[in-house]
Design a protein with these regions (language model features):
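Active-site mouth loops of central-metabolism enzymes
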Residues: 1-19, 69-80, 108-111, 205-217
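N-terminal binding-site loop/beta-alpha segment at the start of enzyme catalytic domains
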Residues: 1-64, 121, 127
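Short, acidic/polar
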Residues: 13-28, 76-93, 140-150, 219-226
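Structured C-terminal cap/extension of enzyme domains
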Residues: 26-29, 33-34, 53, 150-153, ...
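Acidic (Asp/Glu)-rich catalytic clusters
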Residues: 29-30, 52-63, 86-95, 126, ...
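Structural preference for beta-strand elements that scaffold enzyme active sites
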Residues: 34-35, 63-69, 96-101, 130-135, ...
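Distinct, well-ordered alpha-helical segments
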Residues: 46-57, 78-89, 109-120, 140-153
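Active-site groove signature of glycoside hydrolases
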Residues: 89-110
């Protein structure tokens, strides 16, 4: 979710619309979906506390799965990681995270995580039961991901950018990155399936006309279903920010049929 806001812009800073978030959370859970994603830096920390108020305080812990992330901006050395992690648990109001990611890894950032023994620290937290599954989110070339997965076999899953527009973007290396995940048999979470909304509400008129003529759903539905149809993918983050978008997502993902 890109949380709805009372002030500021969606995806930026400001005051979160907690009433609207609660309605979206309830609708999402009522229809059998469970996965919620946050990070310490999202909305200057308000994303984590919104999860606490709208999700954790209002629903049984075993009714949802919650993801948080170790973001490089908030720690400098290994000794900083555990206090940051405990702060994240407190902000979210939970005693463990179902999923925890090394956030936005690039070649340069991976070297820092590796030299600072961040992987060892997060693995220790997992052994203590405070993390159920450890993964990474990734923003670099395929050869970098290959190196990371070879050197860190304890990684359980990988979050990557994957959408139908990026097939022509050599900077993203969409298919090569995906193929590395397949090579190492790592389940994939997709981020940016709608490329920041470009494949949802900002399509060129000609492309929008082609999709509308198919009468098979909204433009966003094609983008999200395209990502969800890939065999290695087990989760797609849709970035919905309104109740209407949540209802649209549910309409084609509740009884999902691959494209």
């Amino acid at each position: 979710m890109r949380l709805p806001m009372l002030t500021g812009e969606v995806g930026g800073s400001g005051e979160v619309d907690l009433e609207q978030v609660s309605k979206m959370v309830d609708l999402f859970l009522d229809n059998g979906f469970t996965y919620f994603d946050t990070a310490h830096g999202y909305i200057s920390g308000s994303s984590e506390t919104a999860m606490r108020e709208c999700l954790v305080k209002r629903h049984p812990r075993d009714s949802f799965t919650l993801t948080d992330k170790l973001t490089g901006n908030y720690w400098q050395k290994q000794e900083d990681i555990r206090p940051l992690f405990e702060k994240q648990l407190e902000a979210c109001g939970v005693t463990y995270f179902d999923y925890y990611l090394m956030h936005a890894l690039t070649n340069e950032l991976y070297d820092r995580y590796k030299s600072s023994h961040a992987f060892e620290e997060v693995l220790a937290l997992k052994k203590e039961g405070k993390i159920r599954h450890m993964g990474i989110s990734f923003h670099d070339k395929a050869y970098v991901l290959d190196r990371i997965l070879k050197e860190q076999p304890e990684i359980e899953y990988v979050q990557i950018q994957y959408n139908y527009r990026d097939i022509t973007d050599s900077g993203v290396e969409r298919d090569k990155v995906y193929d590395v995940c397949v090579k190492y048999n790592k389940p994939v979470i997709v981020m940016e399936p709608c490329k920041g909304g470009a494949l949802a509400d900002r399509l060129p008129d000609q492309a929008k006309g082609i999709l509308n003529a198919l009468h098979g759903g909204s433009p966003a539905s094609y983008a999200i279903r395209f990502a969800a149809s890939q065999p290695q993918v087990f989760m797609v983050l849709s970035g919905m920010s309104t109740l209407e978008q949540a209802q649209d997502n549910i309409s084609y993902m509740k009884d999902f049929k691959p494209l």
